Amino acid sequence: MLALVGNVCPEGPSVSNATTLVPPHTITSEAELDALYAAPTAPSVAKEIVRLNAPYRAMIEASPFCTLASIGPQGLDASPRGDGAGFVQVVDDWTLALPDRRGNNRIDTLRNVVRDPRVALLFLIPGCNETLRVNGRARISTDPDLLASFAVDGKAPVTVLVIAIDAVFFQCGRAVLRSGLWSPEAHVDRSTLPSAGAMLSARS
């Protein structure tokens, strides 16, 4: 039988006093999770630290791409960010700086940050199976000297996210290996996928 649970709405943002049906075999508590999964190994716990060390710094400096997740009143957002390797600057062992290059001006992430500073980053390095995860709190800076330090071809970013690190740890390469992400044999012919124009046309 289906159970009734309040304040859960799978079709969109949570609605006050909303009630929906929870499908059978749905996990609804941490106790149920703990009964299914073994405790993490000691190395899995020990790899998480609150500041950068030399290996973690090297990973960030080698990365040309990361995803940036944020949270706000309208929900969650995950945004791709990329540039030359090391485009996210290591200010010190506790701080990162990420330039906001000119784009489509949706600025979903920035709108979230001014309301809730919590962010999470996932760094990828081409050819490297391990990834690096950073959790922290961001602020949006328009400091002229900071903007100028990120100028490329004479063009400075509009703003820079300054991120205070709360936690940093590497993720093992299993997901990347299983997906064949860096394997040329797994690469998809772009012409077999819908173009940006086709996706825009199909939005309705």
Roles of regions detected by a PLM:
Residues 1-204:
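Binding-site signature for planar aromatic cofactors or substrates
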